[in-house]
């Protein structure tokens, strides 16, 4: 039995000479989540009966400047939702609606008719989508005499209904004079 003690002692000494255990793996580095870009709100189609759509909140304001006359519709102290401009030099009217995107068409609905126009971004800040209308276009008379409201539908934008007030008639008359 005495022979076993030296052997056991040797084995214990050898066991004590083993390499240290490996270092634990480094803690995972938390990477911040990529910023979440909210999806654009879906364009809700109101009922097909557009005269029942709620009117946008705001008032029409008439102004004159070096280019001609301008009617702006929107809430006081905020950017206009809709503009109608008469460029007296070019003898053109421009109907614009607040919004951005690759719009291709604008539909103007009145109590008597509707008309589709090509629309494009104006490049202005804030962003607007606009169409050019000749002063002799019958849609202008339909807008001026529409029964209480006009609807504007622009690709990629929420359709809106705005009141038909005398400022529209003033802009049309300015461009026809």
Q: Where in this protein do the model-derived segments appear?
A:
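Internal interaction segment
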Residues: 20-22, 117, 121-177
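Mid-length scaffold segments of soluble, non-membrane domains
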Residues: 85-122
């Amino acid at each position: 039995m005495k022979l076993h003690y030296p052997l056991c002692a040797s084995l214990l000494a050898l066991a004590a000479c083993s390499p240290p255990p490996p270092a634990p793996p480094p803690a995972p580095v938390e990477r911040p989540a990529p910023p979440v870009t909210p999806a654009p709100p879906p364009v809700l189609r109101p009922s097909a009966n557009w005269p029942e759509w709620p009117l946008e909140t705001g008032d029409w304001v008439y102004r004159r400047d070096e280019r001609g006359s301008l009617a702006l519709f929107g809430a006081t102290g905020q950017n206009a939702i809709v503009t109608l401009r008469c460029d007296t030099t070019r003898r053109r009217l421009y109907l614009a609606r607040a919004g951005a995107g690759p719009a291709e068409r604008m539909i103007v609905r009145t109590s008597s008719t509707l008309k589709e126009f090509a629309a494009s971004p104006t490049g202005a800040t804030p962003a607007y989508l606009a169409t050019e209308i000749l002063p002799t276009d019958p849609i202008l008379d339909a807008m001026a005499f529409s029964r209480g409201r006009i609807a504007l539908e622009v690709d990629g934008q929420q359709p809106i209904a705005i009141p038909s007030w005398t400022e529209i008639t003033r802009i049309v008359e300015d461009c026809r004079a």
